[in-house]
């Protein structure tokens, strides 16, 4: 185990009223994850993190930690907060390598997901846990949406998204149809006629808020999130 990760975990005070958890938008049980890690129960910690947030590995890299979990840590009032982002990344990446379980038994119901951004991926994974037969329709050639095409490589390596596609989608029986736009050649009505009982639309917002400065329209200028 990485020593710096354990050193960071040992700094956690295990507060009775954890402010870090209150600062997390999805209420990740941060004290429990750290406690399990310190007890050498990494698999339990990883399972808990992924069940609460299927994109926990992504969030460990790109979340606004300084204003959320770490920003609410009581240790940060007089010094450095517990850097849970480091701990979460270690747990999630280590446990992800062990995630080889196949799909759940089918409940016979088909669901279409339009868009494979963070919302589409998350709802697809959660539905697959309950036996739904999920198909993701993606307009581009790779999954990820803003995660892949809006966040630069140094913040979120594309290998993380490729691993999610394999372990969380392919192994779970979730089908992905890339380069497929819904709305023109294929309509939502077509999907219902094809037997999909429910449809989730998570196409995202792709138009950037430009700065209106000289040179921003050049071909080698790309918009992204940092």
What are these regions (language model features)?
Residues 177-194:
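A conserved short coil-to-beta-strand element within the FAD-binding core of flavoproteins
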């Amino acid at each position: 185990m990485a020593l710096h990760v354990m050193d960071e975990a040992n700094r956690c005070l295990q507060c009775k009223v954890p402010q870090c958890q209150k600062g997390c938008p999805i209420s990740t049980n941060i004290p429990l994850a750290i406690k399990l890690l310190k007890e050498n129960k990494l698999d339990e910690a990883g399972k808990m993190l992924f069940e609460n947030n299927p994109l926990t590995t992504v969030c460990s890299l790109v979340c606004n930690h300084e204003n959320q979990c770490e920003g609410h840590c009581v240790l940060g009032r007089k010094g450095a907060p517990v850097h849970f982002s480091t701990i979460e990344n270690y747990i999630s990446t280590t446990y992800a390598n062990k995630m080889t379980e196949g799909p759940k038994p089918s409940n016979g119901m088909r669901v279409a997901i339009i868009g494979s951004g963070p919302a589409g991926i998350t709802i697809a994974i959660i539905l697959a846990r309950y036996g739904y037969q999920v198909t993701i329709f993606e307009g581009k050639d790779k999954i990820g949406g803003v995660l892949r095409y809006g966040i630069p490589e140094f913040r979120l390596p594309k290998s993380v998204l490729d691993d999610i596609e394999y372990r969380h989608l392919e192994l779970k029986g979730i089908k992905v149809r890339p380069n497929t736009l819904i709305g023109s050649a294929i309509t939502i009505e077509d999907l219902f006629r094809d037997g999909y009982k429910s449809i989730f639309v998570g196409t995202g917002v792709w138009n950037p808020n430009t700065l209106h400065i000289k040179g921003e329209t050049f071909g080698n200028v790309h918009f992204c999130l940092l």
